[in-house]
Amino acid sequence: MADSRDPASDQMKHWKEQRAAQKADVLTTGAGNPVGDKLNVITVGPRGPLLVQDVVFTDEMAHFDRERIPERVVHAKGAGAFGYFEVTHDITKYSKAKVFEHIGKKTPIAVRFSTVAGESGSADTVRDPRGFAVKFYTEDGNWDLVGNNTPIFFIRDPLLFPSFIHSQKRNPQTHLKDPDMVWDFWSLRPESLHQVSFLFSDRGIPDGHRHMNGYGSHTFKLVNANGEAVYCKFHYKTDQGIKNLSVEDAARLSQEDPDYGIRDLFNAIATEKYPSWTFYIQVMTFNQAETFPFNPFDLTKVWPHKDYPLIPVGKLVLNRNPVNYFAEVEQIAFDPSNMPPGIEASPDKMLQGRLFAYPDTHRHRLGPNYLHIPVNCPYRARVANYQRDGPMCMQDNQGGAPNYYPNSFGAPEQQPSALEHSTQCSGEVQRFNTASDDNVTQVRAFYVNVLNEEQRKRLCENIAGHLKDAQIFIQKKAVKNFTEVHPDYGSRIQALLDKYNAEKPKNAIHTFVQSGSHLAAREKANL
């Protein structure tokens, strides 16, 4: 019904209403030349060929041919919004970062939510981790906290990342999603058990983007004004409450409204129901890290809250929708290596790998000057360096300033106060195999202590419902891993698989076929 349309559906109506007092703009080419006729090409006579001189046509088509840019290799489907971060608690004893400077300070932010494995046209309601990336526009440059909706990940070594993503994408020959690929990789890498268990729990399908938590996931380092450092983890917990979709509702929405998450976020902000998240940190001293029972930089594990409680910091609030999706969401580029003074990287191997991979893929997808794009530009800091030229240089290229360092002409100077915190590091240089690290203790705690009986039942049903489509030998490897977590975990999944495997395949697809003679008669009638 027209009178029940939501703000997202009425976007063009609202755009027109906002411009009601204005005359329509003059239609132009990309170069600003007025266009006299946008409906008809120039031809020799009404039936003749086109003329090369029809620059209105060539301008239009040449741009159309180049509208698409490379899709993100992961996190292709996403929604974005803008707002602010406000400090509510003092953590300057941990970090000198200006974003945390004083209680009440507000910093502009941009946020992008996303699924991971699907293409840009895929459904928002699939079972998949969600990206939750936050860009803080600070006076010391941008800080990009490129997180997910889970505090852990599938792997702990970045060398495995391309293979992991390949296993979640499409088969290189059939171009179909392949359960053999997915479960073969997971079953061969038992460090994935923690994230797999989280993924197939109720939280594996969040109800849109507003009702899920976010996590920096990695271990980071905070440095205060005295040069003292601690390790930390970032958490941002939804103020809307956790809500998840049932398998049935998710499947229905994937057909009826595959952009459900984008629509829900847009409409909430458009109706001034601004979503917010409370921002926390966990802190671990260097001495605590030395005596920690496992590697504190292992991305497949969490820091227990009873030992490292959440410390409140502030609020993330989203109060503006994108003005243009391509300009502000498709082109936004998050980079974990964007860290202002007071926030630094830890030895977390996965974080170290991302420090290179993210800016590298942005230079491929958006070009070497992607930081000139307005949504990526650190507009609250003055950029002054010795980088010049390159495709799509959209600013003044730093004018006549020297492009070499050192120099004697008063060009930008290094700032000792921005030096990274010094750390000691020693050990043999080699490739360390961490596959046999403890992969089950925290998963067992999640299964036994975090989930209740109904949640455990749904977890096992969800896993078996997906694993059943993999080959039997892969099923056995996966069940062996789940059994090592807890015998009940493995036995429940195996019992469900036995039931699936005993059933004969059913063809549930109903088709409607027209006879050849009927089609021939229709064709003859159209002559």
From Swiss-Prot:
What Pfam families does its record include?
A: Catalase, Catalase-rel
Q: N6-succinyllysine is carried by which residues?
A: 13, 221, 306, 480
Q: Which GO terms describe its molecular function?
A: aminoacylase activity; catalase activity; enzyme binding; heme binding; metal ion binding; NADP binding; protein homodimerization activity
Gene Ontology BP term (one): positive regulation of phosphatidylinositol 3-kinase/protein kinase B signal transduction
User: InterPro entries from the xrefs?
Assistant: Catalase, Catalase_3, Catalase_AS, Catalase_clade1/3, Catalase_core, Catalase_haem_BS, Catalase_immune_responsive, Catalase_sf
Class of the enzyme per the UniProt entry, highest EC level: oxidoreductase
Gene Ontology cellular-component annotations: catalase complex; mitochondrion; peroxisomal matrix; peroxisomal membrane
N-acetylalanine-modified residues are 2
Microbody targeting signal, short sequence motif: residues = 524-527
Q: What EC number(s) are associated with this protein in UniProt?
A: 1.11.1.6
Look up the record and name the cofactor or cofactors this protein needs.
heme; NADP(+)
Q: Which residues carry this modification: N6-acetyllysine?
A: 233, 306, 480, 499
* Catalytic reaction list: 2 H2O2 = O2 + 2 H2O
Q: Where is the active site?
A: 75, 148
- Which residues are recorded with the post-translational modification Phosphoserine? 9, 417, 422, 515, 517
Q: Which family does it belong to?
A: Belongs to the catalase family.
Protein name (record):
Catalase
